[in-house]
Amino acid sequence: MEQKTMSIELREKNGKGVARKLRAQDVVPGVVYGKGIEPVSVKVAAKDLAATIAGEGGLNSLITLSGGGSLNGNIVIVADMQRNPLKGDILHVDFHRISLDEKVKVHVPLVMVGTAAGVKEGGMLDVVTYSLDVECLPTAIPEAINVDVTNLAIGHSIHVSELVLPAGIKVLNDPETPIVSIHGKAKEEAPAAE
C-alpha cells in the first residue's frame, strides 16, 4: 500500500471553543495515540486531510506525519473520524501510531464484482455486509476485498467463510456472517403445449 505524507502541527489548547475556532479556519482538531506514547493533541489543514484519505487506501492509508515535533516521521492510520452529519465536514480525527512490523486491526470495504446469475433470472441482490474487520500487517492492508457474485443463484448466499482473501489477511468477523444473497422467485418455465 502506498504511504502518504501529511503535515500536522501540535495543538496547545483543547476544548469546544478552541475546536470551533480551528474549524472556522478550515483546520481539523485531532489526536495521535498509540503504543508507548501519551495522546498528543494535533491540528491538520482540512484540505490536506481530505486529500490524504481520498483515493487509494482511503481511511486505511498509511500516513507519515510531517511536523508536530516528536511526532515527525511517525506512521499512523486513521482510527476514527467524526463528521458533521449535515455538511459532511470532518469535525475531529484520531490517528493511531503504528509499527510496520506489528499487525493492526482495520475495517476493509467489500466490493461486489460481476452480475449475479440470480439477478439475470429476476432476483434481487441483497448486500448485508459492507465491510469486514481484518487483522494484517500495515503494508498488507487491502484497499477493498472483492466478492465475486457472478455465479450466485436465487435463494443462495455468500458467507465470510467462502471469501478468497489476499495472503496475510485474517478476517475477525464470524465465518458464518452472510455477505450477500439473492432473493426472489425463479422464472417459471413456460407450460408445455398440448
From Swiss-Prot:
The keyword Heme does not apply. One of its GO terms (cellular component) is cytosolic large ribosomal subunit. This is one of the proteins that binds to the 5S RNA in the ribosome where it forms part of the central protuberance. Keywords: Ribonucleoprotein, Ribosomal protein, RNA-binding, rRNA-binding. This is Large ribosomal subunit protein bL25. SUPFAM superfamilies: Ribosomal protein L25-like (SSF50715). The keyword RNA-binding applies. GO terms for biological process: translation. InterPro entries: Rbsml_bL25/Gln-tRNA_synth_N (IPR020056), Ribosomal_bL25/Gln-tRNA_synth (IPR011035), Ribosomal_bL25_b-dom (IPR020057), Ribosomal_bL25_C (IPR037121), Ribosomal_bL25_long (IPR001021), Ribosomal_L25_dom (IPR029751), Ribosomal_uL5_bac-type (IPR020930). The gene is rplY.
